[in-house]
Design a protein with these regions (language model features):
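Hydrophobic beta-strand scaffold residues
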Residues: 55, 144, 165, 224-225, ...
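Adenosine-phosphate binding glycine-rich loop
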Residues: 107, 199-308
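N-terminal ligand-binding/catalytic initiation module
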Residues: 1-86
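Flexible, glycine/charged-enriched surface loops at secondary-structure junctions
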Residues: 14-19, 54-60, 111-120, 168, ...
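Rossmann-like adenosine-cofactor binding region
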Residues: 118, 151-231
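Glycine-rich phosphate/diphosphate-binding loop of Rossmann-like nucleotide-binding domains
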Residues: 90-178
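Predominant activation on well-ordered alpha-helical scaffold segments within soluble catalytic domains
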Residues: 4-7, 38-49, 69-72, 96-104, ...
Length: 308
């Protein structure tokens, strides 16, 4: 069920980012800290290969660029590689950049300021994306309170960002302005909702809302929720550039990525504004836009097939 939710989220994420791709998700059941082997990712690569290019895999939670490189030895249908002219590398920094820019959009809207000076961010998860995001938020003047189950990594990120540290479950009780979930999904749920005192939720995790009703409850309480699949689309934009270059026989194009990322911020601005004018939760507005773009993309593809 969780994987199906993730795949639906990827479909919406790709549509919101104006990428004419469907969405899918694959999951390897196991402990990424103790059970990863080259043989495991070779087996994963063979499974992906059976789909014949209808699905491409890439780095995500618990999976590194090196892991993807192992799968690449047995299938061409992986992205986010470090070698070759089309290679886009680790998508995490670009995902973090999109979430960071989204945080600035929210700061301008709620606090009328262009940086994060004086704001406290409770950031959950300092792994791939969260660590990069912590650096960016710190540089913009935010005070950070961090948590992660990886205590060694947590201490490292906290030291370089002058951040406070709390136990994993205590992050919801931090007196903060912004909650930034950057680990696993569904942390916005019936158990955590009443504990949050923030004015905004802006984070990189997928499927942050345990149910749509949680999004409605946030809206009713005046908490601005930046929809996850909108603001964390930088990574998929980055790997889409690799796929685009590979199919055209060209090279990775950072200018194309930047154009898409800027457009993503325009879409976020539209969602936030429509939420105010239409008096609807942001996740509902985002879904309407995503579904409209999916429908338009399907129509364009059908027209091309008919013309061809």
């Amino acid at each position: 069920e969780d994987v199906l939710r993730l795949s639906r989220g990827m479909s919406y994420k790709n549509a919101i980012a104006d990428l004419e791709m469907g969405g899918g998700k694959s999951v390897i059941i196991g402990d990424s800290r103790t059970q990863k082997t080259p043989e495991l990712f070779a087996a994963f690569g063979r499974a992906v290969d059976t789909l014949g290019g209808t699905y491409y895999a890439a780095e995500d939670v618990g999976v590194s660029v090196d892991d993807v490189a192992e799968a690449r030895k047995v299938t061409p249908y992986v992205l986010g590689l470090n070698d070759g002219p089309e290679a886009s590398g680790d998508p995490s920094p670009v995902t973090a950049e999109g979430v960071y820019r989204s945080t600035l959009v929210v700061a301008r809207r709620l606090w009328n300021q262009d940086d994060l000076t004086g704001l406290t961010v409770a950031l959950q998860g300092v792994g791939h994306v969260g660590g990069y995001l912590a650096d960016k938020l710190h540089a913009a003047g935010a005070r950070l309170v961090l948590t992660d189950v990886n205590e060694e990594l947590l201490a490292e990120v906290a030291a370089r960002t002058n951040a406070g540290i709390v136990a994993p479950d205590a992050i919801y009780d931090v007196k903060a302005d912004i909650y930034a979930p950057c680990a696993l999904g569904a942390t916005l749920n019936a158990r955590t909702l009443d504990r949050l005192t923030v004015r905004a939720v802006v984070g990189a995790a997928n499927n942050q809302l345990a149910t749509p009703e949680i999004g409605e409850a946030l809206f009713a309480r005046g908490v601005l929720y930046a929809p996850d699949y909108v603001i964390n689309g930088g990574g998929i934009i980055n790997v889409a550039s690799e796929l685009r270059a590979r199919k055209a026989g060209g090279a990775y194009d950072p200018a194309w990525v930047e154009t898409k990322l800027a457009r993503l911020m325009e879409t976020l601005e539209e969602i936030l504004e429509r939420s105010v004018t239409e008096r609807l939760p942001t996740h509902q507005i985002a879904a309407v836009i995503a579904e409209a773009r999916i429908e338009a993309a399907v129509g364009r593809r059908a027209a091309r097939r008919q013309a061809g």
